Amino acid sequence: MKQIGTGSLWTQAFRFVVAIACLASPQFVCAQATTAPSSDSIVQHDVPMKTRDGVTLYADIYRPSAPGKYPVILMRTPYDKSVNWAVSPAHKMVLRGYVVIIQDVRGRYTSEGEWYPFRHEQADGFDAVEWAAALPYSDGKIGMMGASYVGATQMLAAIAQPPHLAAIAPNVTASNYHDGWTYQSGAFEQWFDQNWTSQLAQNTLQRLITQNTNALVGTPTLPLTDYPVFNFGQLPADGKLTAAIAPYYLDWLAHPDYDDYWKQWSIEENFSKIAVPMLQVGGWYDIFNGGTLRNYMGAKAHGATETARTQQHLLIQIGGHAGFGRRIGDVDFGPHATENPYTDVILDWYDFLFKGIHNALATEKPVKVFTMGANEYRTLDDWPPPQAVPTKYFLHSAGKANSLRGNGSLTASAPKVEPPDTYIYDPANPVPTFGGPLCCDEEHMEPGPRDQRSVENRDDVLLYTTSPLGSDLEVTGPVTATLFVKSSAVDTDFTAKLVDVAADGFAQDLTEGILRMRYRVSPEHTTLMNPGQIYEISLDLWATSNVFLRGHSLRLEIASSNFPRFDRNPNTGAETRAARTSVTASNTILHDAQHPSALVLLVMPSK
């Protein structure tokens, strides 16, 4: 890696993080707000709020100019309260009779204190809600909105139970900041976590320089300067990122197990503390969509109040983490994909709850999802849809399911006597990430559905495909791969993708998953494998809603890497954060009468 002298460290690193933060995603737009307030609104900038421990947080407040008391919508953000993507909806909401407060969270932009993700959001969120309720133009009803980490600030505030919090509307956010934000089934979410950390380092680095240039002395190297791939191929993973800029990142790497460090912030551990209605908004190609679905199901099942349990709503759109729209990746999903824009959805939510307006939310079913293939929104009674039928597609082959040239198949018939499929996983030559749920650098790696045939040409990717369908088949619900596996290594990964194969061969990825074998027993501790021993595992591919059209085929991809979305398993049993060497692994999928590996889907009844 290139070495950077301390004299030029801050200038090069700062220019770098500014550039990527501006380019990577609409959530990190660097331009200041350009939308001017109308004569119907009043804007107050940098309004202070003191937290219980004496730290001052600053907010911009947008409110109607007419005297009176109004419901409040609060956003608490680490991404800068003055950027246009936050401000533009505020003006629209003011015109609908809401006060909108956008607050920089602790340690970010104008607010004082130390930035450390998740650590202060319960207490600070509680304090912010109660402060907002006491403002002279507030009617005491406080709602919240926002995406990604701004969704996390809502969830964490909700489990703190501030008395005046009346509802929240999290968009594309996680349910657990260990599994689903930093790790997934034991594998490190490398592309997201290193991109997100580097983007937020823009402001952290600027604050450090402003406060004390000497804070950076002694850190002569920064992997930020080697972007776009953060030296992803170099081990160990945690050896370069400076603790002065992102100490939490090193803490994340130091806690691969699901331990008390993570449990203190886990939403899943605290669904029983959620006492308010929630509207969860997600996207089929969002990196947090599994968490969005779990947030809905968890609060509905375990919420603290009858209101919380009965007023959970779920909207899954077509899109990724950075936004929704008609086209994502290689696929145009048609005109219906642009329906349900987020700001309008949020306004309808709060009009219904806070103002008693009888809009669609008063009569619609609580779940609405965009169904790919049919390319339209559909409403459901619940998630997962109760009428969907669990259906197994069993894996078959003549012992050579490797690549598009192989003989793997999927059928409804259980296997009998069949040879297994084996491939070599080499950490030095991992299967590349191509599309799927990605954030936050579309310039270098585009998210969403991409034609997977370039990946499927590899011999270290197994393919199991149905015959072309004779009629449409709708799959809506969770997706799981139950596999019987063995390996020559003491630890390895298994990955899977559900793919919709069109008649012309276009292979659209729908959803995907991974399992690090050392965490197959529990996320709380590691259990290495015995080489050659057969294990039954379950890969969670989250969920989808897709109509496999007549003439299309279902396909299950299996491999042992998906890099750089996930870090590479070195196969040695060593923690990847400290690994300096790797070995190849011979990995095997069994499918016979004693080992009936299968893809498990929820199939909707024919109309």
Language model: regions and residue ranges:
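Cap/lid segment of the alpha/beta-hydrolase catalytic domain
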Residues: P64-A134, G180-Q184, F188-Q190, G325-F333, ...
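C-terminal, loop-rich substrate-recognition/catalytic regions characterized by aromatic stacking residues
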Residues: L216-P236, D330-K607
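Short beta-strand/loop motif that positions the catalytic acidic residue
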Residues: I274, Q280-G282
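Alpha/beta-hydrolase fold nucleophile elbow
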Residues: P136-Y149
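Accessory cap/linker subdomain of secreted extracellular hydrolases
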Residues: L95, I159-K273
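Short glycine-enriched nucleophile-adjacent loop
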Residues: G151-P162, L483
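Active-site-adjacent alpha-helix of alpha/beta-hydrolase-fold enzymes
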Residues: G290-Q312
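N-terminal cap/lid segment of alpha/beta-hydrolase-fold proteins
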Residues: A33-G68, T465-S471, F484, H525, ...
